[in-house]
Swiss-Prot record:
HAMAP family, per the entry: TrpD
GO terms for biological process, alphabetical: L-tryptophan biosynthetic process
SUPFAM superfamilies the record matches: Nucleoside phosphorylase/phosphoribosyltransferase catalytic domain (SSF52418), Nucleoside phosphorylase/phosphoribosyltransferase N-terminal domain (SSF47648)
Presence of the UniProt keyword Disulfide bond in the record: no
Recorded catalytic activity of this chain's protein: N-(5-phospho-beta-D-ribosyl)anthranilate + diphosphate = 5-phospho-alpha-D-ribose 1-diphosphate + anthranilate
Keywords: Amino-acid biosynthesis, Aromatic amino acid biosynthesis, Glycosyltransferase, Magnesium, Metal-binding, Transferase, Tryptophan biosynthesis
Positions annotated to bind Mg(2+) 1: S96, E230
Top EC class of this enzyme: transferase
Protein name, as recorded: Anthranilate phosphoribosyltransferase
Amino acid sequence: MPITEQEALLRCIDHREIFHDEMLHLFRKIMSGEMSPVMIAALTMGLRVKKESIGEIAAAAQVMREFSTKVPLTDTTNLLDIVGTGGDGANTFNISTASMFVAASAGARIAKHGGRSVSSSSGSADVLESLGANINLKPELVAESIAQTGIGFMFAPNHHAAMKHAAPVRKELGVRTIFNILGPLTNPAGAPNILMGVFHPDLVGIQVRVLQRLGAQHAIVVWGRDNMDEVSLGAATMVGELVNGEIREYEIHPEDFGLQMIASRNLKVANSVESKAKIFEALDNVDSPARDIVALNAGTALYAAGVASSIADGLAKARAAIASGAARAKLEQFVQVTQALGKA
């Protein structure tokens, strides 16, 4: 007999794990609309209070992947997602979005999965729209965007229709639940490589192990000690790295790469217009904290994608792409191609 919803709640109350097959059953009920809003709220809050285990998160992510609308890609060589869980409260500009243009111009292929703002003043979808890109492409056109530009953006609501059953509950609860950490684990293009920023240090070890269970190829999970869900310039960054099935955990410092430490307040923005200005500052090679943090994150992404042999090698490639104008040109190309595909 499959686990009942009440049994699952009792497990949470007793701080006992819900096993893999049981989580698959429960989350399939959520995604197919068979669980009531009251039970969705109770289960997700119960898991939060108990603290979700690696196995529980992996099973829930597996179900979200099952129910997602996929981007049809046959070749995933050097394909990478650059994504954050959000919720770090740092209100910085869209560092991962800017990094995506740099990484793509240096040889990575990007399948970025994102939505509107969670914690920042503007989410990746908000800022890409303000840059002029079309974020609402159909899955086959996202694949075409990757083929033409090396970048595809997958607007999360377009790929996770089954989440409509949980969305009102999440909104009304207004607190973090397991869903906040599932989004970055459910790339609809099946990107085997990922650079993921997380909002809490405990999630570094958890998410890298979840990605291991989900079969990721090269994953780098980061949390900056100044509470940033990026590779930070303002403090040390905790890293969980999965490569060839093995996990390493370590710290990196800006000084390791000859970079000056700069407080994250220098990267704060109030809205997507300010975020856009910082992105241009970085991509136009203006000597600034914005350029340096984008280069460092893009360099880490190039390493995760298998285009660079190390973060330091990736940083050198990222700097060269910015200095040559290739990164800014990639942004312009992406905007033009997504607009054209949207009219096709």
